[in-house]
A protein has these predicted regions:
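Flexible, low-complexity interdomain linkers flanking nucleic-acid-processing modules
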Residues: 136-147
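Low-complexity, intrinsically disordered short peptide segments enriched in small/polar/basic residues
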Residues: 25, 80, 143-144
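Active-site beta-loop-alpha junctions of metal-dependent nucleic acid enzymes
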Residues: 44-51, 90-94
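Intrinsic disorder/low-complexity signal
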Residues: 7, 50, 123, 143-144
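Charged, low-complexity, intrinsically disordered terminal regions
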Residues: 2-4, 121, 127-128, 145-147
Length: 147
Protein backbone atom coordinates (compact mmCIF):
# COMPACT_ATOMS: atom_id res chain seq x y z
CA UNK A 1 0.00 0.00 0.00
CA UNK A 2 1.37 3.42 -0.99
CA UNK A 3 0.41 6.35 1.25
CA UNK A 4 1.26 9.81 -0.06
CA UNK A 5 0.64 12.98 1.93
CA UNK A 6 0.85 16.32 0.12
CA UNK A 7 1.26 19.28 2.49
CA UNK A 8 1.33 23.03 2.19
CA UNK A 9 1.03 26.07 4.39
CA UNK A 10 0.26 29.66 3.50
CA UNK A 11 0.67 32.95 5.32
CA UNK A 12 -0.46 36.35 4.17
CA UNK A 13 2.24 38.08 6.17
CA UNK A 14 3.87 41.27 4.99
CA UNK A 15 6.84 43.24 6.16
CA UNK A 16 10.05 42.04 7.69
CA UNK A 17 8.61 39.52 10.16
CA UNK A 18 6.27 38.06 7.52
CA UNK A 19 3.68 36.95 10.07
CA UNK A 20 0.08 37.14 8.95
CA UNK A 21 -3.13 35.19 8.82
CA UNK A 22 -2.12 31.61 8.03
CA UNK A 23 -3.65 28.29 7.02
CA UNK A 24 -2.42 24.77 6.41
CA UNK A 25 -3.75 22.02 4.19
CA UNK A 26 -3.03 18.42 3.33
CA UNK A 27 -4.32 15.86 0.87
CA UNK A 28 -3.80 12.14 1.39
CA UNK A 29 -3.73 9.45 -1.26
CA UNK A 30 -3.74 5.67 -0.85
CA UNK A 31 -2.59 3.82 -3.95
CA UNK A 32 -2.97 7.02 -6.01
CA UNK A 33 -6.60 7.57 -4.94
CA UNK A 34 -7.49 10.57 -2.78
CA UNK A 35 -8.91 9.43 0.54
CA UNK A 36 -8.75 12.61 2.64
CA UNK A 37 -8.18 16.32 2.53
CA UNK A 38 -7.96 18.81 5.34
CA UNK A 39 -7.51 22.56 5.73
CA UNK A 40 -7.65 24.84 8.74
CA UNK A 41 -6.85 28.36 9.79
CA UNK A 42 -3.98 28.95 12.18
CA UNK A 43 -4.27 32.62 13.09
CA UNK A 44 -1.18 34.80 12.83
CA UNK A 45 1.78 32.61 11.87
CA UNK A 46 4.79 32.63 9.59
CA UNK A 47 4.80 30.62 6.39
CA UNK A 48 7.29 28.14 7.86
CA UNK A 49 5.03 27.58 10.87
CA UNK A 50 2.10 26.96 8.51
CA UNK A 51 4.21 24.49 6.50
CA UNK A 52 5.07 22.56 9.69
CA UNK A 53 1.41 22.57 10.79
CA UNK A 54 0.44 21.03 7.43
CA UNK A 55 2.95 18.20 7.91
CA UNK A 56 1.76 17.61 11.48
CA UNK A 57 -1.89 17.52 10.36
CA UNK A 58 -1.07 15.00 7.64
CA UNK A 59 0.86 12.80 10.05
CA UNK A 60 -1.92 12.89 12.65
CA UNK A 61 -4.52 11.91 10.07
CA UNK A 62 -2.28 9.02 9.01
CA UNK A 63 -1.78 7.88 12.60
CA UNK A 64 -5.53 7.93 13.31
CA UNK A 65 -6.31 6.03 10.13
CA UNK A 66 -3.59 3.38 10.47
CA UNK A 67 -1.99 4.69 7.28
CA UNK A 68 1.53 3.47 7.92
CA UNK A 69 4.82 4.48 6.32
CA UNK A 70 3.55 7.55 4.47
CA UNK A 71 5.68 9.64 2.16
CA UNK A 72 5.24 13.30 3.08
CA UNK A 73 5.69 15.83 0.27
CA UNK A 74 6.37 19.48 1.07
CA UNK A 75 7.73 22.36 -0.96
CA UNK A 76 9.40 23.84 2.12
CA UNK A 77 13.17 23.38 2.16
CA UNK A 78 13.25 24.52 5.79
CA UNK A 79 10.70 21.95 6.95
CA UNK A 80 12.07 19.04 4.90
CA UNK A 81 15.69 19.66 5.84
CA UNK A 82 15.00 20.22 9.53
CA UNK A 83 12.83 17.11 9.83
CA UNK A 84 15.42 15.06 7.94
CA UNK A 85 18.18 16.32 10.25
CA UNK A 86 20.14 18.12 7.52
CA UNK A 87 19.59 21.59 8.99
CA UNK A 88 19.49 22.61 12.64
CA UNK A 89 16.41 24.38 13.93
CA UNK A 90 17.41 27.70 15.49
CA UNK A 91 14.00 29.37 15.37
CA UNK A 92 12.15 29.43 18.69
CA UNK A 93 8.74 29.30 17.01
CA UNK A 94 9.65 26.29 14.83
CA UNK A 95 11.40 24.18 17.47
CA UNK A 96 8.21 22.99 19.24
CA UNK A 97 6.74 22.05 15.86
CA UNK A 98 9.85 20.06 14.94
CA UNK A 99 9.67 18.32 18.34
CA UNK A 100 6.04 17.40 17.66
CA UNK A 101 7.06 15.80 14.35
CA UNK A 102 9.84 13.91 16.13
CA UNK A 103 7.35 12.65 18.74
CA UNK A 104 5.10 11.38 15.95
CA UNK A 105 8.12 9.69 14.34
CA UNK A 106 8.45 7.65 17.55
CA UNK A 107 4.99 6.20 16.81
CA UNK A 108 5.53 5.19 13.17
CA UNK A 109 7.92 5.59 10.25
CA UNK A 110 7.51 8.16 7.52
CA UNK A 111 9.64 9.80 4.87
CA UNK A 112 9.73 13.53 4.11
CA UNK A 113 10.58 14.68 0.59
CA UNK A 114 11.06 18.25 -0.61
CA UNK A 115 9.36 18.82 -3.96
CA UNK A 116 8.66 21.66 -6.37
CA UNK A 117 5.71 23.89 -5.51
CA UNK A 118 3.73 22.55 -8.48
CA UNK A 119 3.84 19.08 -6.93
CA UNK A 120 1.78 20.24 -3.92
CA UNK A 121 -0.70 22.29 -5.97
CA UNK A 122 -3.75 20.73 -4.34
CA UNK A 123 -3.04 21.59 -0.69
CA UNK A 124 -1.66 24.95 -1.85
CA UNK A 125 -5.03 25.72 -3.45
CA UNK A 126 -6.90 24.52 -0.34
CA UNK A 127 -4.85 26.65 2.06
CA UNK A 128 -5.15 29.75 -0.11
CA UNK A 129 -8.87 29.18 -0.65
CA UNK A 130 -9.27 29.01 3.13
CA UNK A 131 -7.42 32.33 3.53
CA UNK A 132 -9.43 33.92 0.72
CA UNK A 133 -12.64 32.95 2.51
CA UNK A 134 -11.36 34.50 5.75
CA UNK A 135 -10.47 37.73 3.95
CA UNK A 136 -13.93 37.93 2.36
CA UNK A 137 -15.54 37.60 5.79
CA UNK A 138 -13.42 40.43 7.15
CA UNK A 139 -13.96 42.80 4.21
CA UNK A 140 -16.86 45.20 4.82
CA UNK A 141 -19.46 45.04 2.05
CA UNK A 142 -21.17 48.37 2.79
CA UNK A 143 -20.41 51.47 4.82
CA UNK A 144 -22.81 50.12 7.48
CA UNK A 145 -20.49 47.13 7.99
CA UNK A 146 -17.65 49.41 9.13
CA UNK A 147 -17.50 49.76 12.91
Amino acid sequence: MIIEVFCDGASRGQGQKRIGEAACATTIYRNRKKIAQFARGLGPRSNNEAEYEAVIAGLLICSMGDLLNPVIYTDSAVVANQINGKWKCRNDSLLPLLMTVEDIRDEFNFKVVQVERSFVWEPDALANEFLDTLEKRKTPKTKDDVV
